[in-house]
């Protein structure tokens, strides 16, 4: 095996392992965030049964659906997240070679910064093409609030994908893809671009204290998450439409979704669950730091 292939494999494994650990740890926060985001577009949650906020959601989920339901959709998330994050990290370094080859970070700061933004954004968009149906299934499984099998919309990952594919075809599994690409480029560009730029400006980037590294990652994750959050809300609402027919369809398209959320629910609706997203982001920051640590040992 060539050095380049070995390096790619190391990136893939280090990123995937770090991601799977942290994602399982923050799965309950992730589910709360998703329910707050999509409940307005859910057929299972009537207006009077909607969650009032994070605390209400955390209290009611175990009562109504059982404690383990906090991890509903987590298996799909781990399966999805392993290739997503691993591909992001692996492609990021490949794209960095393309965008940053021969760029001096101290003498050409803005070119260095732009190259980092481009490599982070391109990595996110590329990996999204491969794993979008898994992301879609994870969202629909997490949004499923039925208690027993009879009340559930889907029995599991395979059932969700086959049901939607039979109903809507491949298009149903890629519902909201366009706005996802827009959001992921913004998020990944900040997530990787600002993180790498900040680390690169330190005197000795290879030997950064883990606390400093975590603080940089924490800030980057929170900012990136908030900036791209409205795109995430719209894409999840669009995902909730797959499998619906006729009068059940709430939005005619992405633009209509943006317009209706703003008009009917107000601008705040774009940020429903955003606070839990910041908390969840601590896991994202942990992934970046853990990835750097794992790479030292492989």
Swiss-Prot record:
Q: Which residues carry this modification: N6-methyllysine?
A: 52
Q: Where is this motif: Nucleotide carrier signature motif?
A: 235-240
Which residues, renumbered to this chain, carry the PTM N-acetylserine?
A: 2
The UniProt entry annotates Solcar repeats at 6-98, 111-201, 212-297
According to the record, the segments passing through the membrane are 8-37, 75-99, 110-130, 179-199, 211-231, 274-291
Under the heading PROSITE patterns, the entry gives: SOLCAR
The Gene Ontology CC terms held by the record are: mitochondrial inner membrane; mitochondrial membrane; mitochondrial permeability transition pore complex
Q: How is its activity regulated?
A: The matrix-open state (m-state) is inhibited by the membrane-permeable bongkrekic acid (BKA). The cytoplasmic-open state (c-state) is inhibited by the membrane-impermeable toxic inhibitor carboxyatractyloside (CATR). Proton transporter activity is inhibited by ADP:ATP antiporter activity.
Residues exposed to the Mitochondrial intermembrane side: 1-7, 100-109, 200-210, 292-298
Expression sites (tissue/organ): Detected in heart muscle (at protein level). Detected in heart.
Its membrane topology, per UniProt? Multi-pass membrane protein
Q: Which keywords describe this protein according to UniProt?
A: Acetylation, Antiport, Membrane, Methylation, Mitochondrion, Mitochondrion inner membrane, Phosphoprotein, Repeat, S-nitrosylation, Transmembrane, Transmembrane helix, Transport
PTM entry text: Under cell death induction, transglutaminated by TGM2. Transglutamination leads to formation of covalent cross-links between a glutamine and the epsilon-amino group of a lysine residue, forming polymers.
- Mitochondrial matrix-side positions: 38-74, 131-178, 232-273
Under catalytic activity, the entry for this protein gives: ADP(in) + ATP(out) = ADP(out) + ATP(in); H(+)(in) = H(+)(out)
Question: N6-succinyllysine occurs at which residues?
Answer: 147, 245, 272
Q: Name one GO biological process term.
A: mitochondrial ATP transmembrane transport
Q: Does the keyword Acetylation apply?
A: yes
PTM sites of type S-nitrosocysteine: 160
Phosphoserine PTM sites in chain numbering: 7
Annotated function: ADP:ATP antiporter that mediates import of ADP into the mitochondrial matrix for ATP synthesis, and export of ATP out to fuel the cell. Cycles between the cytoplasmic-open state (c-state) and the matrix-open state (m-state): operates by the alternating access mechanism with a single substrate-binding site intermittently exposed to either the cytosolic (c-state) or matrix (m-state) side of the inner mitochondrial membrane. In addition to its ADP:ATP antiporter activity, also involved in mitochondrial uncoupling and mitochondrial permeability transition pore (mPTP) activity.
Give the multimer and partner information. Answer: Monomer. Found in a complex with ARL2, ARL2BP and SLC25A4/ANT1. Interacts with ARL2BP. Interacts with TIMM44; leading to inhibit the presequence translocase TIMM23, thereby promoting stabilization of PINK1.
How are the domains described in the entry?
The transmembrane helices are not perpendicular to the plane of the membrane, but cross the membrane at an angle. Odd-numbered transmembrane helices exhibit a sharp kink, due to the presence of a conserved proline residue.
PANTHER family for the chain: ADP,ATP CARRIER PROTEIN 1-RELATED-RELATED, ADP_ATP TRANSLOCASE 1
Family (UniProt)? Belongs to the mitochondrial carrier (TC 2.A.29) family.
Descriptive protein name: ADP/ATP translocase 1
């Amino acid at each position: 095996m060539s050095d380049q292939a070995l390096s790619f494999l190391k990136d893939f494994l280090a990123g995937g392992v770090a991601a799977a650990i942290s994602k399982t740890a923050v799965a309950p926060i992730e589910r709360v965030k998703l329910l707050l985001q999509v409940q307005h577009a859910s057929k299972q949650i009537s207006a009077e049964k909607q969650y009032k906020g994070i605390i209400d959601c955390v209290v009611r989920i175990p009562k109504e659906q059982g404690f383990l339901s906090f991890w509903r959709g987590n298996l799909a998330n781990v399966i999805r997240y392993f290739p997503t994050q691993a591909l992001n990290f692996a492609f990021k370094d490949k794209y960095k070679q393309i965008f940053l080859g021969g760029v001096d970070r101290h003498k050409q700061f803005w070119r260095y910064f732009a190259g980092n933004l481009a490599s982070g954004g391109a990595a996110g968009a590329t990996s999204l093409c491969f794993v979008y149906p898994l992301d879609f299934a994870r969202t629909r499984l997490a949004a499923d609030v039925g208690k027993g099998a009879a009340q559930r919309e889907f029995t599991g990952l395979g059932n969700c994908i086959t049901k939607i594919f039979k109903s809507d075809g491949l298009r149903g599994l890629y519902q909201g893809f366009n706005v996802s690409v827009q959001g992921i480029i913004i998020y990944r560009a900040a997530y990787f671009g600002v993180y790498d730029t900040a680390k690169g400006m330190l005197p000795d980037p290879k030997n950064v204290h883990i606390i400093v590294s975590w603080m940089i990652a924490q800030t980057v994750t929170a900012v990136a998450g908030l900036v791209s959050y409205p795109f995430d809300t719209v894409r999840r609402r669009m995902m909730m439409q797959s499998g619906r027919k006729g009068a059940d369809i709430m939005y005619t398209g992405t633009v209509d979704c943006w317009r209706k959320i703003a008009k009917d629910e107000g601008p705040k609706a774009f940020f429903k669950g955003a606070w839990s997203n910041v908390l969840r982001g601590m896991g994202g920051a942990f992934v970046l730091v853990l990835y750097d640590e794992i790479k030292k040992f492989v």
